[in-house]
């Protein structure tokens, strides 16, 4: 099913395409789409799959630096954090094992969502484009791996601890409700 881009729509509603085990069916259509495009570009040439994994990992490392710049002062601490992320042996699995692409794709969209949300919150005026991008990236993270649901408590924690004070609990709930609903639809669906 990965050998034809015509199967891509089915990746979004057939859970048996990612996992053949009926008890542990995982929903990761974005990963399947990336594999299908990889196959379409270079068939089964393993090197191309590794190049894609390395490219996604490089983007993730840059996003770690960008997130670090939000919370750490100076240039060096975020840069060191990004380099540790890029070079740490624990992350080599994500680059080396083609089947681990779900982690890196999830991280790519998770970090993008968090970054857009943080920039939207730090803007003087509420930024609808940034919040919309954050929600779309969150959906992408969920379509990559289920661990992305942890973005919701992370945003709640950051609202409480780092971002400018929220005027009321009602405002906080209003801001986080779309993220909670996306996570709920993913978990229940």
Residue ranges and their predicted role:
Residues 1-189:
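Polytopic membrane enzymes that build or remodel cell-surface glycoconjugates and lipids
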């Amino acid at each position: 099913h990965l050998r034809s881009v015509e199967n891509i729509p089915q990746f979004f509603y057939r859970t048996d395409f990612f996992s053949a085990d009926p008890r542990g069916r995982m929903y990761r259509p974005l990963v399947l789409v990336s594999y299908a495009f990889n196959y379409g570009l270079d068939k089964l040439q393993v090197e191309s799959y590794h190049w894609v994994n390395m490219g996604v990992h490089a983007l993730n490392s840059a996003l770690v630096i960008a997130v670090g710049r939000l919370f750490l002062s100076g240039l060096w601490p975020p840069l060191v954090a990004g380099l540790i992320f890029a070079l740490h042996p624990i992350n080599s699995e994500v680059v080396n094992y083609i089947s681990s692409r779900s982690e890196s794709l999830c991280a790519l969209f998770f970090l993008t969502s968090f970054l857009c949300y943080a920039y939207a919150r730090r803007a003087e005026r509420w930024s609808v484009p940034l919040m919309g991008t954050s929600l779309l990236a969150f959906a992408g993270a969920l379509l990559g791996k289920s661990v992305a649901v942890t973005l919701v408590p992370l945003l709640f924690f950051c609202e409480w601890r780092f971002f400018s004070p929220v005027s009321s609990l009602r405002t906080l709930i209003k801001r986080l409700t779309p993220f909670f609903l996306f996570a709920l639809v993913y978990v229940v669906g």
